[in-house]
């Protein structure tokens, strides 16, 4: 997994998202949401993902909403879209 910041401030995730990446990803997302009212994630570069990674995204999104902040997904790769559809996870 690689995380970069686009020119517009969105976080671009690239590569594979697996359970081994969950803690690092959680730290990055929570850290960004502590200093901003909105966080945009670009998942178009994600090649593979597991349900643990998607569950983390759903959890962070719910936490953000509870704190009256927004976690927005700007785009989903076909792989992420398929896993969301198969598991019923709403992103």
Show where each model-derived region lies.
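STAS-like cytosolic regulatory interaction modules
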Residues: 1-49, 59-91
């Amino acid at each position: 997994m690689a995380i970069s910041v686009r020119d517009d401030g969105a976080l671009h995730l690239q590569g594979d998202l697996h359970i081994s990446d969950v803690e690092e990803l959680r730290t990055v997302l929570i850290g960004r949401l502590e200093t901003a009212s909105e966080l945009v994630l670009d998942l178009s570069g994600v090649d593979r993902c597991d349900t643990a990674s998607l569950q983390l995204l759903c959890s962070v999104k719910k936490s953000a909403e509870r704190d009256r902040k927004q976690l927005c997904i700007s785009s989903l790769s076909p792989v992420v879209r398929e896993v969301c559809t198969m598991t019923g996870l709403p992103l």
